[in-house]
């Protein structure tokens, strides 16, 4: 039987235990009704009505209803009659004069009872004069008072308060408006001025409920409008805008209500810990994370709609009401457009509906003139109307296609025009595929932006390659990009590179097919269309090769160069790759990745210039490194004989996989070593391959790799590359490239302590027990299936193994310990972290020195899967 709200509470029900029970029954009833798809608007209003009943009865129970000059008033969200399960219940006890101490004590007992009931009560006890005095200096208090609603008590007292609140002297409309605009700016800044946050605050994020409240507050202060419906009656909203705001508010309320029934304490953050459950409550389902991604897509789209309406309506209010309709003189640009101040506007009220292709003309003007900062509010309203009434996508209009390509080829379009086209929904109106990626997120820590936002940021990063001030950060791209003759090919590849996401299948293949069709439709030649399609299809190739393959292996370079084909493709690909990494996550780009990509770029460039039929001779490379290193060592006073004796202990691989400067640095310290039986640990002062090099020399011992990486992990250092070698006389020559937790080289002040501790551990000779740090909170809500794959390789002597797993603390040490447990030799490792996932490559041999057998591979797969799963939170 459905729970019924009581009309009254009798005296027996006013016992605290009974009240708690009644509240719990009501809360469970609301949860059940919500999960049975009862309209959230009804539930939000019903909760407010229920609290009204409870507070009225308690007010009467305490005897306050007999007092003539005191009133109980709901303020804030409760004043609006909007309560979610964990919403604060904000009340004001207002009187005409200061309460006597005995009455004040009784009021305190009333508030204490509400707290004892576990209600989230925010309260104030003030006289009317105090309300006005405090509210005059405090915008939040003033805003809450605007939404005050009498619950019970003195009507005269409440009306006197309302009269003073609505007087012109208390926060005049213009003053209130400007203060709320500044408050909103500051709030948006706290969320980086974007609607796209991984764990968004439903209430406060740009485009969230607070943006709707801001519109309501401004309209209430100026017009006296108490609801969205009244705002439309005053002409502040059109009927269509009113319906859209109601629709957006309803969706955000449903998300918030679903979140609140999952929480025990008040919070409006849609964290990773609760996104899946909220999605399930709202009926979003699918394989894996599909349900979450579908919900968040609608969530982000809703935020975009609210943010757009908020910005437009506040500007219209400013222009029409605050400035009294006065505007700057217009400067005519052409027959269709003019500029007024820093804003562009259409000269005809139905321009976009009559000739939709002129929408693109507006953005060509914006690209032509850097002083145009945006679109005027009336034109924005016209654009929104035209956008909704389009009966076909803009790309189907031949004139629009020409104008779009003019923008793609425009040297200034990347700076502002494309981001504005996206923000104002024009890219979605132009290209159906783009409309599908708007709000498309991925439930992980790697992609911090939605697909559409990421793609726009990618375009902006490409634009930065033309700016001299970015040369130090992106030396190759800043050198290459200015000489790219057909930049439009790169820009189109950027637009399409992720456009296939969210549709199942390989997004690179989907995007390549659609990019080719788009290019042909827009008048590009077949070779140009093929180049764009190739870039889209292979936009991950360079990043994957650099970070997850052994780029010091000549065969890897040759294979990569064959796929790239020519220098023009290489130059386009490196620009796309770097921009893609930078636009995926601000924390991804560091000196390590820059160095890896630079080495791959230059090695491939040399291979292409030399000709793929003329691969580099490994012996020549070894000889070159030895000659250069020997010259450096002789400058330090070492004889050729000393150098030769030392080098006779090393295998050829050592000279192939280190630079001549690394070799000279290692050998200088080895030649100065007083006791060769003691471990040597070196830490580079200068960055090596974009990180700090840790060189370890000691007698080979069990689980040495696991020991070293475990010690580094304890100090919050991340190993990104490892070269593991054993000399002919059984000494290890291991090199680790390490970064700190911020992706930077290790602070030199820590070098001495780290080297000393590692030396002590290695001298002890016993394997270090793997002690894992606590798994970070943001990793605890992700599940990554452990996968062990053995990759095809031309080598008959070595096995390549790729591990994919949750990037838990101690993972690498556990992997190393497993190798030692199974008598498997490790020769190299490439460590890649992609958000919450580790994707690591290991070069292995059996204890006998050859490739692993199928039986050994299977045993390793099973043991690794078992051990890694034990690390999961």
Swiss-Prot record:
Known catalytic reactions: [protein-PII]-L-tyrosine + UTP = [protein-PII]-uridylyl-L-tyrosine + diphosphate; [protein-PII]-uridylyl-L-tyrosine + H2O = [protein-PII]-L-tyrosine + UMP + H(+)
The record's CDD domains line, in alphabetical order, gives:
ACT_ACR-UUR-like_2, ACT_UUR-like_1, HDc, NT_GlnE_GlnD_like
The cofactors required by this protein are:
Mg(2+)
Q: What residue spans carry the region label Uridylyl-removing?
A: 333-692
Anything known on activity regulation? Uridylyltransferase (UTase) activity is inhibited by glutamine, while glutamine activates uridylyl-removing (UR) activity.
Q: Which superkingdom heads the taxonomic lineage of this protein's source?
A: Bacteria
Report the Gene3D superfamilies cross-referenced here: Beta Polymerase, domain 2, Hypothetical protein af1432
The record's InterPro entries line, in alphabetical order, gives:
ACT-like_dom_sf (IPR045865), ACT_dom (IPR002912), HD/PDEase_dom (IPR003607), HD_domain (IPR006674), NT_sf (IPR043519), PII_UdlTrfase/GS_AdlTrfase (IPR013546), Polymerase_NTP_transf_dom (IPR002934), UTase/UR (IPR010043)
Residues covered by the ACT domain: 693-777, 800-873
Record EC number: 2.7.7.59, 3.1.4.-
What function is annotated for this protein?
Modifies, by uridylylation and deuridylylation, the PII regulatory proteins (GlnB and homologs), in response to the nitrogen status of the cell that GlnD senses through the glutamine level. Under low glutamine levels, catalyzes the conversion of the PII proteins and UTP to PII-UMP and PPi, while under higher glutamine levels, GlnD hydrolyzes PII-UMP to PII and UMP (deuridylylation). Thus, controls uridylylation state and activity of the PII proteins, and plays an important role in the regulation of nitrogen assimilation and metabolism.
Q: Which family does it belong to?
A: Belongs to the GlnD family.
- What is the designated name of this protein? Bifunctional uridylyltransferase/uridylyl-removing enzyme
| Source species of the chain | Vibrio atlanticus (strain LGP32) (Vibrio splendidus (strain Mel32))
List the gene name: glnD
């Amino acid at each position: 039987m459905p729970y019924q709200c009581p009309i009254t509470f009798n005296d027996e029900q006013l016992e605290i235990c009974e009240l708690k029970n009644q509240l719990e029954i009501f809360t469970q009833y609301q949860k059940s009704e919500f999960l049975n798809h009862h309209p959230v608007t009804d539930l939000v209003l019903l909760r407010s009505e229920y609290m009204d009943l409870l507070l009225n009865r308690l007010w009467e129970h305490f005897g306050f209803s007999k007092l003539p000059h005191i009133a109980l008033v709901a303020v804030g969200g409760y004043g609006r009659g909007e309560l979610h399960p964990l919403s604060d219940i904000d009340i004001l006890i207002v009187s005409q004069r200061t309460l006597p101490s005995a009455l004040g004590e009784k009021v305190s007992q009333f508030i204490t009872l509400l707290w004892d009931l576990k209600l989230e009560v925010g309260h104030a006890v003030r006289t009317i004069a105090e309300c006005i005095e405090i509210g005059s200096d405090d915008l939040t208090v003033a805003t809450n008072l605007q939404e005050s609603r009498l619950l019970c008590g003195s009507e005269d007292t409440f009306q006197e308060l309302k009269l003073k609140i609505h007087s012109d002297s208390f926060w005049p409309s213009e003053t209130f408006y400007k203060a709320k605009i500044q408050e909103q700016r500051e709030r948006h800044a706290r969320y980086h001025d974007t609607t796209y946050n991984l764990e968004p605050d439903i209430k406060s994020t740009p485009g969230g409920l607070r943006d709707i409240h801001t519109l309501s507050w401004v309209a209430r202060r100026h017009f006296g409008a108490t609801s969205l419906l009244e705002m439309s009656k005053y002409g502040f909203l059109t009927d269509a805008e009113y319906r859209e705001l109601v629709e957006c508010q309803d969706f955000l309320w449903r998300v918030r209500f679903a979140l609140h029934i999952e929480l025990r304490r008040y919070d409006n953050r849609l964290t990773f810990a609760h996104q899946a459950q909220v999605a399930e409550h709202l009926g979003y389902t699918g394989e894996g994370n599909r349900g979450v991604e579908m919900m968040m897509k609608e969530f982000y789209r809703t935020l975009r709609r609210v943010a757009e309406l908020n910005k437009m309506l506040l500007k219209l209010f400013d222009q029409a009401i605050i400035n009294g309709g006065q505007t700057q003189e217009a400067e005519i640009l052409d027959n269709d457009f003019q500029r007024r101040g820093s804003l562009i506007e259409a000269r005809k009220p139905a321009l976009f509906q009559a000739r939709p292709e002129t929408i693109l003309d507006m953005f060509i003007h914006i690209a032509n003139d850097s002083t145009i900062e945006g679109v005027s509010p009336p034109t924005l309203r016209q654009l929104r109307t035209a956008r909704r009434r389009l009966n076909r996508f803009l790309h189907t209009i031949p004139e629009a296609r020409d104008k779009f390509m003019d923008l793609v080829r425009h040297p200034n379009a990347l700076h502002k025009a494309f981001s504005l086209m996206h923000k104002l929904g024009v890219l979605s109106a132009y290209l159906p595929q783009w409309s599908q990626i708007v709000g498309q997120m991925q439930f992980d820590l790697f992609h911090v932006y939605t697909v559409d936002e990421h793609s726009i940021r990618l375009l902006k990063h490409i634009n930065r390659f033309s700016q001299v001030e970015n040369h130090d950060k992106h030396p190759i791209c800043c050198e290459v990009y200015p000489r790219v003759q057909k930049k439009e090919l790169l820009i189109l590849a950027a637009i399409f590179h992720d456009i296939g996401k969210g549709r199942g299948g390989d997004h690179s293949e989907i995007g390549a097919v659609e990019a080719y069709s788009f290019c042909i439709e827009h008048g590009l030649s077949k070779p140009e269309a093929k180049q764009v399609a190739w870039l889209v299809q292979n936009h991950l190739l360079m990043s994957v090769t650099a970070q997850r393959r052994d780029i010091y292996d000549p065969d890897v370079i040759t294979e990569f160069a064959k796929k790239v084909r020519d220098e023009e493709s290489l130059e386009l690909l490196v620009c796309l790759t770097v921009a893609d990494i930078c636009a995926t996550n601000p924390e991804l780009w560091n000196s390590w990745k820059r160095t890896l990509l630079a080495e791959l770029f230059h090695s491939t460039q040399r291979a292409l210039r030399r000709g793929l039929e003329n691969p580099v001779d490994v012996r020549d490379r070894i000889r070159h490194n030895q000659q250069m290193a020997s010259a450096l060592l002789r400058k330090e006073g070492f004889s050729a004989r000393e150098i030769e004796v030392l080098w006779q202990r090393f295998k050829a691989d050592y000279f192939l996989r280190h630079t001549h400067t690394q070799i000279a640095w290692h050998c200088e310290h080895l030649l100065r070593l007083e006791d060769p039986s003691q471990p040597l640990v070196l830490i580079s002062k200068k960055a090596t391959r974009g990180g700090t090099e840790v060189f370890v020399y000691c007698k080979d011992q069990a689980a040495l790799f696991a020991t070293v990486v475990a010690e580094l992990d304890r100090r919050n250092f991340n190993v990104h590359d490892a070269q593991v070698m054993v000399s002919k006389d059984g000494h290890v020559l291991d090199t680790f490239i390490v970064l700190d937790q911020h992706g930077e080289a290790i602070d030199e002040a820590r070098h001495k302590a780290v080297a000393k501790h590692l030396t002590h551990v290695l001298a002890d000779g016993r394997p270090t027990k793997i002690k894992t740090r606590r798994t970070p909170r943001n990793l605890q809500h992700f599940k990554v299936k452990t996968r062990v794959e053995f990759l095809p390789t031309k080598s008959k002597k070595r096995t390549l193994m790729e591990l994919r797993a949750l990037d838990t603390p101690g993972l690498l040490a556990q992997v190393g310990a497993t190798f030692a447990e199974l008598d498997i030799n490790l020769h190299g490792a490439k460590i890649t972290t992609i958000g919450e996932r580790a994707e690591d490559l290991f070069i292995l041999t059996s204890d006998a020195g050859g490739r692993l057998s199928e039986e050994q591979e299977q045993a390793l797969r099973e043991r690794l899967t078992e051990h890694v799963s034990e690390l999961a939170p």
